[in-house]
Amino acid sequence: MLTPRVLRALGWTGLFFLLLSPSNVLGASLSRDLEHPILSFDPSNISINGAPLTEVPHAPSTESVSTNSESTNEHTITETTGKNAYIHNNASTDKQNANDTHKTPNILCDTEEVFVFLNETGRFVCTLKVDPPSDSEWSNFVLDLIFNPIEYHANEKNVEAARIAGLYGVPGSDYAYPRQSELISSIRRDPQGTFWTSPSPHGNKYFIWINKTTNTMGVEIRNVDYADNGYMQVIMRDHFNRPLIDKHIYIRVCQRPASVDVLAPPVLSGENYKASCIVRHFYPPGSVYVSWRQNGNIATPRKDRDGSFWWFESGRGATLVSTITLGNSGIDFPPKISCLVAWKQGDMISTTNATAIPTVYHHPRLSLAFKDGYAICTIECVPSEITVRWLVHDEAQPNTTYNTVVTGLCRTIDRHRNLLSRIPVWDNWTKTKYTCRLIGYPFDEDKFQDSEYYDATPSARGTPMVITVNGSFGIGCNFRVGDNHDCPMFIHSTRKIFDYNLIVM
């Protein structure tokens, strides 16, 4: 054939063909229908040795182009854009083309998975294999490069089982959802040796090259981010656009955890210890496994009260929280609680750990009593940072209205002390609620408090109540203890009749 001889004369061996960015592409539109893909675009040539082919037309011509040579064969090419396809006829080589249609094509890629870290470049290489080989291999086939994104949704799930004793995790595949596929590029070669491609919709995101000598195609995915997680399809089609081979190469976007922290909130003596392990900003979800240790020994979470959940932050990655509950005897010292985190992707593994020791608080003893016109609060065995706040009818009182003193050290708990605080009672002839509250514990504000009512009513006092009445009226009734008194009153507005005292027993 004429074309192979011409290309061999130009230096077939060692040539690299580069699919450049859309700056070298004239513009195109591609059908997204993957079941029946139809090419409809104005193709652009792929450069040879970095220089564009000058004789390649701007767009496929609707006219037939004939090329005569000194040989007895005529090579005719017909390009039809109205049918959205290329038709290649070679009258002198019908037998050769007939043989080519029976060739067995295949695509061999150097990997099935590409693990690439965030903001870096992922690469893979695929080789076209045709048995038996011929110079027209590329002319008979089309290569489509299709990207199928996979995204993760933020969900919550309790731990169901341990993969290893004490090792828990959330399977990321449970939360993986495919998105709409996207045709990245469609590559074909005409009988003159020129490679054509559709423009990439992502600018310089994808870089594709072809080596005609080794029949290999390389793909680079630059500046990888979370949206690049998914798999590439390399689809080989025949010149009738029928799919022959479909290879999948998974693009695994990777990000090691940015930080690991253990939070162990304070507890009261005798209450269970609780801890949370927070693994921040990793990818993908499901790549992190958490195990727990208590004083260096394996601690196993309980499925009925412990678990893990995660969420995804756009631009930052996934965050996982794992929890554990441990017993508290109330006698032993608080344990060292450790979280061991293993991040795994393929053959890569990264481990880290964090530790926390919870603070244990002891129950204080409070008592409230009234004496000599004061509400007196006695407190035993509190840490030095604890103070007292008084409330009257649940309203906080200024600290200038009461005083608190240290009365000594606690005999049963080291570095704890005893307090006494008092506030004057209100002599307002009613019942008044007084509350002595301890402030400074890392629990609910009303966790430690005592409340009592001070009864200042006359009946509670058990003494006569003297009422002085000044008035200009007359009154006519007799008072007896225990009676209900309905007394008629005669009011005189001009003069004062008398002053008197009513004594009610």
UniProtKB/Swiss-Prot annotation:
Which residues face the membrane's Virion surface side?
Answer: 28-464
Q: Which residues form the Ig-like domain?
A: 257-355
> Where does the UniProt annotation locate this protein?
Secreted; Host cell membrane
PROSITE patterns linked: IG_LIKE
Start and end residues of each stretch annotated as Disordered: 51-85
Ranges of Low complexity compositional bias?
61-71
Entry keyword set: Glycoprotein, Host cell membrane, Host membrane, Host-virus interaction, Immunoglobulin domain, Membrane, Secreted, Signal, Transmembrane, Transmembrane helix
Query: Which sites carry carbohydrate?
Result: 45, 90, 99, 119, 211, 353, 399, 428
SUPFAM superfamilies referenced in this protein's UniProt entry, alphabetically? Immunoglobulin
Residue ranges that the UniProt entry lists as topological domain Cytoplasmic: 492-505
Q: Name one Pfam family in it.
A: Marek_A
GO CC entries? extracellular region; host cell plasma membrane; membrane
- Transmembrane region(s): 465-491
Task: Specify the signal sequence span.
Answer: 1-27
State the annotated membrane topology for this chain.
Single-pass membrane protein
Highest taxon listed in the record's lineage: Viruses
What does it do? May play an immunoevasive role in the pathogenesis of Marek's disease. It is a candidate for causing the early-stage immunosuppression that occurs after MDHV infection.
Q: In which family does this protein belong, per the annotation? A: Belongs to the herpesviridae glycoprotein C family.
**What is the designated name of this protein?**
Envelope glycoprotein C homolog
User: Which species is listed as the source?
Assistant: Gallid herpesvirus 2 (strain GA) (GaHV-2)
Q: Which gene underlies this protein?
A: gC
